């Protein structure tokens, strides 16, 4: 009996458990590491003298803006508003600018510019930016009897540049602005080849052809334009001083914010716990900074930066590491949105899921006192929808399935993140700035959001599809379009560019009165589109963040502007 119950002391034979083969994305390490932690330990305070000077300069500029507009002063005020906006300080003067441009609308209606191409174009752009649906028919007067733009305009470089910038405000069926874009691009390219003697103007031409004002990030444009404006002999010295001062004051705030986020990220120990993913905390903060740089959005920026950083880890888990079975488990846990679901996850997924739940719980608690914690539920649902789309793509990849292009878009526009990001960007904004109905608007995929997802997705697919296919990835839009239509890669890109151009027109249309939601909310979506346009302009600058992206971040978060 005893021998029958005895247990052998020899260890049981080991099971031959084979580690799953995982793709190797081989992302480079963080460019910034702990660089910004120094701003947490030694925060720079704004001294009373600087603060006083800032207020004095602001008041001087305000007085210049509130003077009544007349025909004689119209050009001066238009130039002042344009400079204020491009220097990144318009947020101080929203009310005054709105009043001035309302008066400028009357001058527009009275057709006071005659044959001045520069002024006509400038007024058109500023009024369109303000949401006024002014007619582009005004540019007909610059055409000859053959219906072409007058050749004499080719000598007016400043006017051509102004017209070029105005064409980027076009909406659908504005053929004259399409013609103007083609005309001005051709002429301005000739200006570059001819080596214009006015080097400051030449610099602006090169800059504009690379990234027009409508598509530029406010903060980066400010950094660039300060260097241009100070070389302008007719510049407003008060405005120049104020812009430099304001830039540096805001930079100190932004440095402290990214320091806070770096400390949070360091405590998560991402580089060790999630070594397969892109370590891009500072780049994610830069993304949030693109959405809103103004001081009143500090809470929103930090929330948005954390959300984007976590979503980036989840994205890489689906694209670059997780097995089909593991991703199904994570999707189920996310859809349940229950911390207890963590027990079903592989060990490496648990820190990400835990922090995702904790982050949204913390946001909800922070907003509770303001009576706006309801916002977090909208944000959660947008994240769940995106993760579900990630999993749909994982199923396609697992089954070696290449969908039709339209079928692909139904999922890929959600997985782009640009349906989720606008909703989440609203969450941390002030109580009175985002009415409840704005969350219903943004979460129902309105035209503005739909257009932004098209731009984000197609820009991504154009520049990233070859690298993604090399490492093993679901078919991108390029492959789907090529297969369905028997097209070449070049033909697919041409079609994508057409759709991106059309989406920009949708965005411009949505920013004209009557507005679906307040302009400052539309600007959040617009800024996200501007960021993604920059993001993919020279390849994938997020994945490969050690070149252009590093330079952009350094110019805004490291290098101050000499006064």
Swiss-Prot record:
Name its GO BP terms in alphabetical order.
Answer: diterpenoid biosynthetic process
Catalytic activity annotation: (2E,6E)-farnesyl diphosphate = germacrene C + diphosphate; (2E,6E)-farnesyl diphosphate = (-)-germacrene D + diphosphate
What EC number is given for this enzyme? 4.2.3.60, 4.2.3.75
Identify the enzyme class: lyase
Residues that, per the record, bind Mg(2+) 3: 468
InterPro entries the record matches: Isoprenoid_synthase_dom_sf, Terpene_cyclase-like_1_C, Terpene_cyclase_plant_C1, Terpene_synth_N, Terpene_synth_N_sf, Terpene_synthase-like, Terpene_synthase_metal-bd, Terpenoid_cyclase/PrenylTrfase
SUPFAM superfamilies, alphabetically? Terpenoid cyclases/Protein prenyltransferases, Terpenoid synthases
Keyword annotations:
Lyase, Magnesium, Metal-binding
- Residue positions binding Mg(2+) 1: 315, 319
Instruction: Tell me its cofactors.
Output: Mg(2+)
Family as reported in the entry's similarity comment: Belongs to the terpene synthase family.
Q: What is this protein called?
A: Germacrene C/D synthase
